[in-house]
């Protein structure tokens, strides 16, 4: 049973609504389905470390990859529920962050769960009945969901900075140049973090475009 893989990306793929990556691990290519929201990172990274869930069937083996181990472990809990297959499990983790999904299940918020495509009210209620007393470990011991939400917000800002770093690096800028120029964003971390967490995907893209223009202008000034 494969539990974890580290390797070099060969290419990314898309089949219908499913997206993933092929990893070269010791000369063997592993085809792994990812959460769609992880594909942007897959496009720019050459090396991956993924937590894996493996499903074996008569017609072949499927691998599902997750950047964080708690995503993989919650995925396993979700697909243990009768009537929920791996594609619905992936859709739920695409729709929600782990603490948000755990919170919805523990608080019996079936209407929130039905936001996920493929989840009707009956399946949402079954998910709640079967899992609501099994997810304590995902709340990080004694931490509250509210504290976890703060962690998510900080993590979102960190991922946002990572994305900008990768874009600048792909444009040929070196580490020291990038770290210095990114300070114009990190100096206002609290303000920018709040903006990110209250913005739609389109607004986040506009914010990133604005920040990249500011950074590139600053970098061009240094080279003149």
From Swiss-Prot:
For the region Domain II, what residue ranges are annotated? 68-146
Q: Where in the cell is it found?
A: Cytoplasm
Q: What is this protein called?
A: Holliday junction branch migration complex subunit RuvA
Which protein family is it in?
A: Belongs to the RuvA family.
Q: How does it assemble?
A: Homotetramer. Forms an RuvA(8)-RuvB(12)-Holliday junction (HJ) complex. HJ DNA is sandwiched between 2 RuvA tetramers; dsDNA enters through RuvA and exits via RuvB. An RuvB hexamer assembles on each DNA strand where it exits the tetramer. Each RuvB hexamer is contacted by two RuvA subunits (via domain III) on 2 adjacent RuvB subunits; this complex drives branch migration. In the full resolvosome a probable DNA-RuvA(4)-RuvB(12)-RuvC(2) complex forms which resolves the HJ.
Give the matching SUPFAM superfamilies: Nucleic acid-binding proteins, RuvA domain 2-like
What species does this protein belong to?
A: Prochlorococcus marinus (strain NATL1A)
Alphabetical keyword list: Cytoplasm, DNA damage, DNA recombination, DNA repair, DNA-binding
């Amino acid at each position: 049973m494969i539990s974890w893989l580290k390797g070099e990306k060969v290419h990314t793929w898309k089949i219908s609504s499913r997206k993933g990556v092929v990893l070269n691990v010791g000369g063997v290519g592993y085809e792994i389905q990812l959460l769609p929201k992880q594909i942007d990172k897959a496009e720019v990274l050459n090396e991956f470390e993924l937590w894996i869930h493996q499903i074996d069937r008569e017609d072949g083996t499927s691998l599902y990859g997750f950047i964080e181990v708690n995503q993989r472990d919650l995925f396993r809990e979700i697909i243990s529920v009768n009537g929920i297959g791996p594609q619905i499990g992936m859709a739920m983790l695409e729709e929600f962050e782990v603490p948000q999904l755990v919170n919805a299940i523990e608080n019996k918020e079936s209407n929130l769960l039905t936001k996920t495509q493929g989840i009707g009210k009956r399946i949402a209620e079954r998910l709640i009945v079967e899992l609501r007393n099994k997810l304590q470990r995902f709340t990080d011991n004694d931490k509250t969901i509210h504290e976890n939400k703060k962690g998510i917000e900080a993590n979102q800002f960190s991922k946002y900075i990572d994305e900008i770093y990768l874009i600048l690096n792909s444009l040929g800028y070196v580490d020291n140049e990038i770290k210095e120029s990114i300070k114009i964003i990190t100096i206002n971390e609290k303000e920018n973090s709040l903006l990110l967490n209250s913005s739609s995907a389109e607004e986040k893209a506009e914010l990133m475009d604005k920040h990249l223009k500011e950074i590139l202008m600053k970098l061009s000034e240094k080279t003149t």
